[in-house]
Amino acid sequence: MNQKAYFGEFGGSFVSELLVPALRELEQAFDTCLKDEEFQKEYFRLLKDFVGRPSPLTLCQNIVSNPKVKLYLKREDLIHGGAHKTNQALGQALLAKKMGKTRIIAETGAGQHGVATAIACALLNLKCVIFMGGKDIKRQEMNVFRMRLLGAEVREVNSGSATLKDAVNEALRDWASSYKDTHYLLGTSAGPHPYPTMVKTFQKMIGDEVKSQILEKENRLPDYVIACVGGGSNAIGIFSAFLNDKEVKLIGVEPAGLGLETNKHGATLNKGRVGILHGNKTYLLQDDEGQIAESHSISAGLDYPGVGPEHSYLKEIGRAVYESASDIEALEAFRLLCQKEGIIPALESSHALAYALKLAQKCAQEKIIVVNLSGRGDKDLSTVYNALKGGLK
């Protein structure tokens, strides 16, 4: 057993034999690039000059009514592409280029990873094909247009529930027959090894930046670090720097959808069971017969019935806690941040914010809370408009 492939019992590489050579080649190339000073130098140059890192850490001025609480937002909404997805899309695309690949395939739910992949491919002159569920294409028309504008081919997937998991299945099928010239640029910290570790590596600058920024501003670490969790890449990115700081509570917020008591949610770590999906062992939403259940969230980017294996491990060992926020709570947090702080957040990030605002109200002592504002909400305006019927309170 390859111990590097596992987080406790979670992770691994449960794939068809056709994909074993591709994953082995990818792992070797990734390990080489981690030690390659030229690769690291080029990657961090692009993060600075092209992506616009470091992203700011913003203290909220008006949204928290409890004077004992300081709420900071890690502003991934301000980087190029509008979300944290650009960080690791660029890392993987650069790695693919070093491997001699000429074609990139990717899956996308909210469209944000698809846009980030298309951006990286345009920059690095790589052919780009994006697989996207038909249901998500309808929800995210503007992101589909953005991808095509950036030169990507968008392939509609109408099998299964026509959402993210089905797009992943189609991308894996393509890769099995095309890996000699193609890299599969997986969008979250799930999938077979080495993807969970690779995606975390290309997102960990979020947590590293927060740590130095909060020490500079407050001269101490935060009490809470909070992030939304679908597949979990933005969360593992910000959690990574604080895993050994036991005094910092790490909270992932899953989509409760229409309620945890219904079957219309995406709260995998709250309501799921351990199983295997997309090449890794992790918590999954399953029906009574062990089949993968359909997830639901108002946010397309959280609408996934699995979760990254490291999150399953962090839950098991108690290092992170996984809470949830409903569609209605996320919409209210979205509205509040717009009206109180002048920031339009992604609906994904609004789930983390919703939980943080509830937590802030309960704090009886002075506390510092950091929320990863993983993306901006331009892509969600039509969804929010329809949900609120065009009206705001």
Swiss-Prot record:
Query: Which InterPro entries does this chain map to?
Result: Trp_synth_b_CS (IPR006653), Trp_synth_beta (IPR006654), Trp_synth_beta/beta-like (IPR023026), TrpB-like_PALP (IPR001926), TrpB-like_PALP_sf (IPR036052)
GO CC terms on record? cytoplasm
- Keyword Amino-acid biosynthesis belongs to the record: yes
The molecular function GO annotations come to: tryptophan synthase activity
Keyword list (alphabetical) reads: Amino-acid biosynthesis, Aromatic amino acid biosynthesis, Lyase, Pyridoxal phosphate, Tryptophan biosynthesis
Identify residues that carry N6-(pyridoxal phosphate)lysine.
85
**Highest taxon listed in the record's lineage:** Bacteria
Q: Which cofactor does it need?
A: pyridoxal 5'-phosphate
Q: Which NCBIfam families match?
A: trpB
- Self-association and partners: Tetramer of two alpha and two beta chains.
Q: What does this protein do?
A: The beta subunit is responsible for the synthesis of L-tryptophan from indole and L-serine.
What's the family?
Belongs to the TrpB family.
Please give the HAMAP family that the UniProt record associates with this protein: Trp_synth_beta (MF_00133)
Q: Can you name this protein?
A: Tryptophan synthase beta chain
Source organism per UniProt: Helicobacter pylori (strain J99 / ATCC 700824)
In the UniProt record, the gene name given for this protein reads trpB
